[in-house]
Structure formats: C-alpha cells, structure tokens
Amino acid sequence: MNNPIPSNLKSEAKKAAKILREFTEITSRNGPDKIIPAHVIAKAKGLAILSVIKAGFLVTARGGSGIVVARLPDGKWSAPSAIGIAGLGGGFEIGIEVSDLVIILNYDRAVEAFAKGGNLTLGGNLTVAVGPLGRNLEGNVALRSSAAVFTYCKSRGLFAGVSLEGSCLIERKETNRKFYCQDIRAYDILFGDTPRPAQAEDLYEILDSFTEKYENEGQRINARKAAREQRKSSAKELPPKPLSRPQQSSAPVQLNSGSQSNRNEYKLYPGLSSYHERVGNLNQPIEVTALYSFEGQQPGDLNFQAGDRITVISKTDSHFDWWEGKLRGQTGIFPANYVTMN
C-alpha cells in the first residue's frame, strides 16, 4: 500500500500515477476481470486518487491524502489539486487498515463539488456506487448508472473494506499554495486557469493512455459490428445457387495433354461430361466479373471474391446454372448467377 500521510503535491502526483497503474494493469494479482475498464476513465469528468488509513477501537477514524484532476473542455486533464480525506464511524471494530482509492467523477456536478472547496461529504452531497470492473465490460454499463461517483478500493489490513459514506474530502489549500507558489483555489486549478505541471507528467501519461485504449477499443468494436452487418447484408442479398450440380466423384483428377485433357479433367464431376456435351467448349473463352463472393462447398468448386474477373471455360445458356471457369491458376465450377458478363 502507498503512504497515506499527507505530503507535497509532487509526491502526491507520483503516488497517484502509481495507484492508477495498480488499478488498471493486468498482473499476476489482477486478472482482466479485476481492473478498472478503460472506458470508465476515458469518459470520466474527473478523478480523485488517494491513500487512506483507517483505525478503530469501538469508534473508527479514517484519514488520508491525494489529488483530484478534472477533464477540461478540450479533452485534456487539468493540473492536480491536493485533497485530504477524514471521517469517523461507529460500530465495534478493532484494527488498522491502509487502502488505496480511485474515485471516478462521472458528472460535471461532481467536479464542481470538488472545485468549490470546503468540505465535501460523500454519500451526502454526492451519490456513491462501487464502480464496474472488467476489461471487456461494455461501455454502456457505466452510462446506465445514475451515481455521480464510482469508487474503487484496494485494502490491506484487518477490516473487510473501506466505506466512504460520510467521509469528508477537504481542499488542502496550503499544499496547493506551496506547489504553485501563489494563493490559488481548487476552482482555478480544476477549470484550466493553471497550466498542468511537468512534475505530474507520469500521471498525465497514464491518463492519456486510457483515451487511446478506449478509442482503439471503440474502433475494433465498430469494425466487428460493421463486419457482422456486412455479412448479414450479404447473406440477404446473395442469390440462390442452382439446385442441380454435376455429380461429384472421389476419383482423383488427372490432366493429360491434347484434346483428351478436357474429358479427363472432369472426372471429379462425372456428370459434367454430359453437361459439356450439351453446350460444347468455348472456342474463345470469355471473362465475367463476380458480383458476389462465393466460397466453394465441395471439391472442384471455384472460390472467388466480389470483383474478381473469372475466365469462363464452358457455360450453358442459362445464368441459373453451373459454369466452369479459371481464376488465379485454379479451375472449377461456380454458380453463374453470381457473375455478370464483361
């Protein structure tokens, strides 16, 4: 666990980056179902990252420190503002617990509550819910929640966990003043009046990576959806294949030279001989263009993609029939209603 004792803002920003990595990277201790989804952070209006210590003997007390950052209108993250956390609780609890917390601010009103300064009570001023977990969680799951704040906690100690209900978040004005070398309020820091400091670059690097992950994930999802829709559309638009096809044989194909080659070539489909006798071979092969993709279903079928140009070796007078053609050195039969004459 990280140090919950309040320190300067540079150290708090460094601690925040470390905590955020621990909550979002897959490790031997964190499986893909135990991390904060990229879209939760990518869509967040702000984040508060803290370390908290909780001690109890009949009455429990908690305290800790961290930072809060907000997303600016241009999509970038604001400079960090130092915060503290404090709270009291009842119940017969004995022990000490140190926890790392990531608090996701889902709405602008949550950021504004942090920016106004003073004491902010979680569960009073803002509705709190345990945040969703899992790398493959769909983005709309988080959007369906009405909670202004998501919380994530990792604890080590004798308590089962940390409840933030009733905890107060406090603006650490003196820490901000020392770091920014001026009297400055959280509002001015979180709403972009202060340039983000180089000392917090590690934090910004990991925050920006979530936007990139989310965008890449969205592109992959959109590509898969488009591919599925295209397959559905293609399946609807494909014309029916001819019902009758030449009879298939398991005999190997043998190719000989000369006029005998055509007859031996059709041993894979013995029925094709009468088919050719009915039509005859073309003296000058013609070309057709595939309107649809065709994936062969039996040996001897000619595979092609929409747009391929196929050389026709022999054909019938009907387009609702099987023709024979050649493409990229392969010879086979194909449904004639899948192509158009050039």
Curated annotation (Swiss-Prot):
One Pfam family per UniProt: SH3_9
Subunit structure and binding partners: Interacts with SH3D19.
Compositional bias ranges of the Polar residues kind: 245-263
UniProt xrefs under CDD domains: SH3_SH3YL1_like, SYLF_SH3YL1_like
Membrane spanning stretches: none
Similarity comment: family membership: Belongs to the SH3YL1 family.
GO-annotated cellular components: ruffle membrane
Keywords, alphabetical: SH3 domain
Domain of life: Eukaryota
Gene Ontology biological process terms from the UniProt entry: phosphatidylinositol biosynthetic process; regulation of ruffle assembly
Domain SH3: 283-342
Keyword NAD: no
Region (Disordered): 218-266
GO molecular function terms noted in the UniProt entry: phosphatase binding; phosphatidylinositol binding
Keyword Nucleotide-binding set for record: no
Name the UniProt record assigns to this protein: SH3 domain-containing YSC84-like protein 1
Biased amino acid composition, Basic and acidic residues: 226-239
Native source species: Homo sapiens
PROSITE patterns, alphabetized: SH3 (PS50002)
